[in-house]
């Protein structure tokens, strides 16, 4: 590495808000299954506190050694609906509390996996877990929840979609922060290091380390140097920058896995913003020539960014995965917040952008009087985009306040302006239930 690369890396960290967003340890809980829910809870606590005992210390050690901030240390676990199904319990709040207790004991920021996979229907534990979500999130501090309601191979479980509209409303009524820790997915991935949607897939190794990086500020600074040049130059610049960011992510992941004595999983190539000025995906898109995010051309700019991040990242790391793309959470991106406030970015444009970005309608505040069926219909729209386009999409919606209000979450979750929602009813559509079949192009065998 020559001196220029060293100075570039220092500038990325000190001036451009580069950091490792998360080191996430995935832990299988399949060996914690027990017909007695209290024994299962104890086994879960013991396994997490044993396997992840040194996660925070190792993360801090690597951050100090390399001089690179590692913002979050997290844990993801096997979907709890699979663990709870072996018991006769009628709710799984006790398992959520075991996760929360373990997370506090080891000092991690969040623990994900209070989850169910229901893309083709409910098994015994799924419905119980889904109905436990409002209380589980209200009575814990660090637990995150996700439900996968659709996939390209299975179609969309519209009964589950309707249920999740209701659950989001109930969760919002029971706690202020609960809905910020609840994600509804289509095509959820098993190795996601980011919250709130992380869970440890059943096909994964017993314990793994996954890494998520953050570098919108680095990309923006690189694009400032090629202002006015062609898209060919823009694409090459983004690709080279993504390579540098991902290289550091792989180094951190490999160091963590070696020191913790567990397998290295993947680096997630996502560009994850924060509310800090200079750490915004929206500002990257504007640097390409848009007056403001939300205007015509936004979706094309996002497509270029997303694709080149993947191309640069894949060359830098031999194991990539997770969501891998650009995140567009409204409350967590100061440029997105500004675009909503000036009227150029609305829900409909955000939905179009989700056909390309790595997640979906993320951290978006809507009026608290929005009907559950309307929320369910928003989930159905997002799921349809994901299912048809063979990509992950998700909804993390915050029904709080009234249109125009600002909802304050603090920290990385930021501030969300309450956005206008189409007032026409979707009740008859959502009340049908059943399954939207898988698309024809999913039939590959």
From Swiss-Prot:
Q: Which InterPro entries match?
A: UPF0210
Which Pfam families does this chain map to?
Answer: DUF711
Q: Which family does it belong to?
A: Belongs to the UPF0210 family.
Subunit structure as annotated in this protein's UniProt entry: Homodimer.
Fetch the PANTHER family from UniProt: UPF0210 PROTEIN MJ1665 (PTHR37560:SF1), UPF0210 PROTEIN SPR0218 (PTHR37560)
The protein here is known as: UPF0210 protein SPG_0223
């Amino acid at each position: 590495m020559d001196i220029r690369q060293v100075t570039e890396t220092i500038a990325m960290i000190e001036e451009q808000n580069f950091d490792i967003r998360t080191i996430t340890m995935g832990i299988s809980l399949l060996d914690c299954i027990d017909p007695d829910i209290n024994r299962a809870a104890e086994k879960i606590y013991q396994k997490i506190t044993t396997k992840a005992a040194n996660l925070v210390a190792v993360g801090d050690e690597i951050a100090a050694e390399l001089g690179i901030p590692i913002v979050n240390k997290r844990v993801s676990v096997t979907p709890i609906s699979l663990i709870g199904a072996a018991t006769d319990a009628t709710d799984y709040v006790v398992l959520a509390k075991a996760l929360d207790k373990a997370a506090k004991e080891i000092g991690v920021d969040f623990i994900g996996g209070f989850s169910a996979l229901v893309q083709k229907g409910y098994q015994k534990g799924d419905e119980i877990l889904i109905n436990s979500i409002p209380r589980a999130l209200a009575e814990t501090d660090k637990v995150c929840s996700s439900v996968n309601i659709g996939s390209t191979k299975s179609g969309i479980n519209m009964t589950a979609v309707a249920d999740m509209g209701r659950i989001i409303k109930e969760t919002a009524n029971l706690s202020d922060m609960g809905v910020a820790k609840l994600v509804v997915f289509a095509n959820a991935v098993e190795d996601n290091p980011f919250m709130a949607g992380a869970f440890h897939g059943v096909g994964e190794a017993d314990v793994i380390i996954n890494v998520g990086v953050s570098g919108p500020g680095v990309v923006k600074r690189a694009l400032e140097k090629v202002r006015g040049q062609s898209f060919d130059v823009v694409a090459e610049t983004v690709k080279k920058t993504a390579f540098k960011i991902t290289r550091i992510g792989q180094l951190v992941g490999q160091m963590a896995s070696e020191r913790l004595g567990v397998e290295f999983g993947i680096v997630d190539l996502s560009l994850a913003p924060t509310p800090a000025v200079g750490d915004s995906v929206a500002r990257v898109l504007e640097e390409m020539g848009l007056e403001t995010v939300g205007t015509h051309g936004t979706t094309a700019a996002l497509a270029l960014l997303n694709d080149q991040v993947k191309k640069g990242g894949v060359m830098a790391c031999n194991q990539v995965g997770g969501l891998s793309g650009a995140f567009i959470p409204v409350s967590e991106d100061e440029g997105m917040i500004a675009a909503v406030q000036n009227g150029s970015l609305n829900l409909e444009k955000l939905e179009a952008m989700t056909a390309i970005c790595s997640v979906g309608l993320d951290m978006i505040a809507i009026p608290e009087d929005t009907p559950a069926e309307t929320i369910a219909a928003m989930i159905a729209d997002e799921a349809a985009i994901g299912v048809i386009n063979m990509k992950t999409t998700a909804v993390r919606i915050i029904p709080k306040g009234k249109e125009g209000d600002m909802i304050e979450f603090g920290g990385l979750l930021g501030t969300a302006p309450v956005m206008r929602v189409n007032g026409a009813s979707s009740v008859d559509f959502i009340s049908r239930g059943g399954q939207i079949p898988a698309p024809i192009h999913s039939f590959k065998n």
